[in-house]
A protein has these predicted regions:
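N-proximal low-complexity "stem/linker" segments adjacent to membrane-targeting elements
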Residues: 2-7, 83-136
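Short, acidic, metal-binding catalytic loop of nucleotide-sugar glycosyltransferases
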Residues: 25-29, 135-144
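A conserved acidic beta->alpha catalytic loop
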Residues: 151-161, 179-181, 204
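Glycine-rich, basic loop-to-helix element that forms the pyrophosphate-binding segment
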Residues: 178-195
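Short aromatic/hydrophobic "clamp" motif used to bind/position activated sugar donors
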Residues: 200
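Conserved donor NDP-sugar-binding/catalytic core segment of glycosyltransferases
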Residues: 214-260
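Acidic donor-binding loop at a coil-to-helix junction in glycosyltransferase catalytic cores
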Residues: 309-316
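Catalytic core of nucleotide-sugar-dependent glycosyltransferases
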Residues: 332-340, 345-383
Length: 477
């Protein structure tokens, strides 16, 4: 029987003389030890699988020579699982070091030894599309994450495909259900239950999160312990990166699209509204993707409803908005892909979603949990006529008052400048302000379209700016 813990013993070739000593004394080791060198550094990824390799030991004159090898491959919390030895003269001391390090990590606060973020994805015959989601994860500035994939495909063929992905990165934890459910609320409930991170993110199998999403979200959560949910703006695109949007009256008049350049393409980015009793009343008003919870909060809310094969997201978001503090990171964080034939799994069920959500879930939930009263207490209540009868865009309401309970964070910028009309670009101060990457700009016009504003920004070299245009606007808009 193998002895615990399992240990990687990393030494560079110039210290390979220690190998003979270890081989000669292997029966005296109180662990299972594998010697690796500078050509085996990819094996360090196995340390993300706590069940396989527990401890890392480095050997040589100084631990500093190993830092450039190790830290790009591991994460900060793993420093507690790594110790360095300059010499090994006494196996008793070495065995003590190894087992103390092992048990210390086993009995530490669980949050300190587990990933900061759990990303959970449920999938059904995703195949190559899931690599797009994986690329977005690999590019994250915050690398301390795990990806929980729960496969709900009807046979094992797809699961065998996914195994090839999980072999390359032990941050991926792959699970297969005992049979196809088809009920997305049920499967998401199970996926969340498998997560270990302090924070959780729902990621669709074929979508992309932007590189700074996890980092920014982690900082928002850590800045305020009362925040239980974070969301950002998002964009919808087809497989060929053509823009898709839901029209100017999305979100019961509370939402607009602005143009933002990402990877050389100008995307229609949906500016998700703040949270109040109106924006919470329909799924198209609530935060779309990304959705990020403090895991403890999501579980306290009861997790996704296993009863709901559709509208599961609407129901859990209603609970979330009513019961925890919410923050918005006011920037593009998520790109959602649509099939070119509009045949997404969610779109197929739109008829049922649009029947069940507004006609049954919303009114019954609002009545059972007195949602309007909840938002009155939060100072985020608007006239209930806007829930069903009046969808006028908020910038056209002369009596509109901005009442929301969500807080806003914008970590990339110190200042935001709103430029009214294209002539504002002629102001000489703009070119100087634009040189500072910590300044953000939104160009607004009620005379020309967003597409024409984009052309003007490109021509002037201001493609870091965002813009929104109403070609048929009025002076009041």
């Amino acid at each position: 029987m193998s002895k615990y813990p399992f240990v990687y013993f990393l030494r560079t070739s110039k210290y390979s003389g220690i190998d003979n000593f270890i081989e000669q004394n292997k029966d005296k080791l109180e662990c299972t030890l594998e010697i690796i060198g500078e050509n085996d550094l990819d094996k360090l990824n196995n340390l993300f699988d706590n069940s396989k390799y527990h401890i890392l030991v480095t050997f040589g004159d100084s631990d500093k020579e190993y830092i450039p090898m190790i830290m790009p491959r591991l994460v900060d919390r793993m420093r507690n699982r790594w110790f360095h030895r300059k010499t090994i003269d006494n196996l008793g001391d070495f065995n003590k070091n190894v087992n103390c390090c092992f048990v210390f990590n086993a009995i530490m606060n669980r949050e300190d030894v587990r990933p900061k973020f759990s990303i959970f994805t449920t999938c059904y015959n995703s195949y190559d599309k899931i690599y797009r989601a994986y690329e977005g994860l690999k590019n994250q500035l915050l690398r301390d994450w795990e990806w929980v994939i729960l496969d709900d495909s009807p046979d094992d063929k797809h699961f065998e495909f996914l195994k090839q992905l999980s072999k390359t990165d032990k941050r991926i934890r792959l699970y297969n259900r005992d049979g196809n459910s088809g009920s997305i609320g049920h499967v998401k409930n199970e996926a969340v239950s498998l997560c270990r991170g302090k924070y959780v993110l729902e990621l669709d199998h074929d979508d992309i999160i932007l590189p700074d999403l996890l980092k920014d979200t982690f900082e928002v959560f850590e800045s305020d312990k009362e925040i239980g949910f974070v969301f950002t703006d998002f964009a919808n695109v087809y497989e060929d990166w053509r823009n898709f949007n839901y029209g100017e009256h999305l979100g019961k008049g509370n939402v607009c699209y602005y143009k933002h350049k990402f990877n050389g393409k100008w995307l229609d980015v949906c500016s998700c509204p703040g949270i109040n009793n109106i924006t919470t009343s329909h799924l198209i008003c609530l935060p779309n993707h990304p959705r990020m919870w403090r895991r403890k909060v999501l579980l306290e809310l009861g997790n996704y409803s296993e009863f709901l094969p559709i509208c599961d997201d609407f129901e859990i978001l209603l609970r979330t908005m009513c019961h925890t503090k919410v923050a918005k990171i006011h920037k593009l964080g998520y790109i959602q892909f649509m099939n070119n034939d509009n045949n997404n799994f969610s779109l197929i069920r739109n008829g049922e979603i649009n029947r069940l959500g507004p006609n049954w879930i919303r009114p019954m939930f609002y009545e059972m949990y007195k949602v309007n009263d909840v938002f009155k207490q939060k100072g985020a209540y608007e006239d209930e006529k806007y829930i069903e009868k009046d969808m006028t865009q908020i910038w056209k309401r002369k009596d509109y008052e901005h009442k929301v309970c969500s807080v806003v964070s914008n970590p990339n910028y110190d200042k935001q400048y709103c430029l009214l009309g294209i002539d504002a670009l002629n102001d000489k101060r703009i070119s100087e302000l634009y040189k500072n990457s910590r300044n953000d700009f939104m160009l607004l016009s009620n005379k020309i379209s967003s597409d024409d504003l984009v052309k003007e920004l490109e021509k002037r070299g201001y493609d870091r700016m965002k813009c929104f245009g109403l070609s048929e606007g009025t002076t009041d808009c």
